């Protein structure tokens, strides 16, 4: 025995069964924590193929990542309208790192025998890693810190559940709590369809 110490890596999401899911993680990745967190939030809950296409589009700047939490001093773009925000960016490096992790998780799912065409991003989390410390030299002999903000990423893919159609009487009961504006829109829609 070479003295190898294999231990179970802990994921933040404990309630997802390992048999029906595929996991991937990256540690101490040299990519911006804030950009990666916003990009990860954008793909959370997406189907795998849609998430891969979205990240490719972000790299090509045809789709945009909405910035909600870390949105200070961020410029506005019209592409953010599809997410209902004005502040949005195209974090290419974060998109590439997440693409690589998604492809790794997809390969893990294929190895486990899961249906790769039916996978969704069930859990994705970005944590801060220890900051890299360098220095930059300023005027008058001063020195300022020149920090990097790397991150750890973990994600879990699961097979999507089949959606069951609600019974018509249940759908009608839900309509009881509509505002007058929603009821009016519903009536207009019914008139247009008739």
From Swiss-Prot:
Keywords: Ribonucleoprotein, Ribosomal protein. InterPro entries: Ribosomal_uL22, Ribosomal_uL22_CS, Ribosomal_uL22_euk/arc, Ribosomal_uL22_sf. GO terms for molecular function: structural constituent of ribosome. One of its GO terms (cellular component) is cytosolic large ribosomal subunit. One of its GO terms (biological process) is cytoplasmic translation. Gene3D superfamilies: Ribosomal protein L22/L17. Pfam families: Ribosomal_L22 (PF00237). PANTHER family: 60S RIBOSOMAL PROTEIN L17. Belongs to the universal ribosomal protein uL22 family. This is Large ribosomal subunit protein uL22. It comes from Aspergillus fumigatus (strain ATCC MYA-4609 / CBS 101355 / FGSC A1100 / Af293) (Neosartorya fumigata). The lineage of its organism: Eukaryota, Fungi, Dikarya, Ascomycota, Pezizomycotina.
């Amino acid at each position: 025995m070479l003295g190898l110490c294999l231990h179970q890596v802990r994921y933040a999401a404990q309630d997802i069964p390992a048999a029906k899911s595929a996991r991937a993680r990256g540690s101490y990745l040299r990519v911006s924590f804030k950009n990666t967190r916003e990009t990860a939030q954008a793909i959370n809950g997406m189907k795998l193929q849609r998430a891969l296409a979205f990240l490719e589009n972000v790299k090509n700047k045809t789709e945009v990542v909405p910035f909600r939490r870390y949105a200070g001093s961020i410029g506005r773009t019209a592409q953010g309208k599809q997410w209902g925000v004005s502040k949005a960016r195209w974090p290419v490096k974060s998109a590439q790192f997440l693409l690589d992790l998604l492809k790794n998780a997809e390969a893990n799912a294929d190895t486990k025998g899961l249906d790769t065409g039916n996978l969704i991003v069930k859990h994705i989390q970005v944590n801060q890693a220890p900051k890299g410390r360098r220095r930059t030299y300023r005027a008058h002999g001063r020195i300022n810190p020149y920090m990097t903000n790397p991150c750890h990423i973990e994600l879990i893919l699961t097979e999507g559940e089949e959606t069951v159609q609600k019974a018509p009487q249940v759908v009608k009961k839900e309509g009881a709590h509509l505002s007058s504006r929603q009821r009016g829109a519903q009536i207009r829609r019914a008139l247009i369809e008739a």
